[in-house]
Amino acid sequence: MFKKFSIFISSSCIIAACIFTPSNTDDNFIFPIKSNYYITSKFGYRTLYGKQNFHTGLDVAYSVGTKVYSSSDGKVSYIGFDHDGYGNYIIISYNNFKFLYAHLNDTHNVSLNDTVFKGTLLSSIGPKILPNGKRNGNTTGAHLHFEVRVDNKYMDPLDFISLPK
């Protein structure tokens, strides 16, 4: 379904652009947290540590221990730890979608190749420094970094999931 239609006017031509957004605005996917939220960084370009970079997801501040749930049905396709980036993280794959949940407390609630359902408890928000002394990725504090990828392309999570009211 075509969700947006924009016309951009240049000095010498008109360019029409249709932006395709899958029809998933009917709550096929859910927000991964079931409590109040505070968005600290949106998808797109941002300045962090004095440098401009592209942020591939949505950062939402929460207290350490806040539960994180699967946004969709799917399969656990990756579980890992990245000291310089995501910290503890889990990827759930569903059709051509991948949902990444990062800076988690641990990854023990699910195993690789597990089938999960929308609302399945995946983990909880982890601290900046994990109990083993390792940094929980590139983080300035406790938060969930949440990504949506479609056909392995980074997409704005807010195009697919409505924020809780």
Where are these predicted regions, by residue range?
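A short, sequence-level motif marking secondary-structure junctions
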Residues: 75, 102-109, 159-165
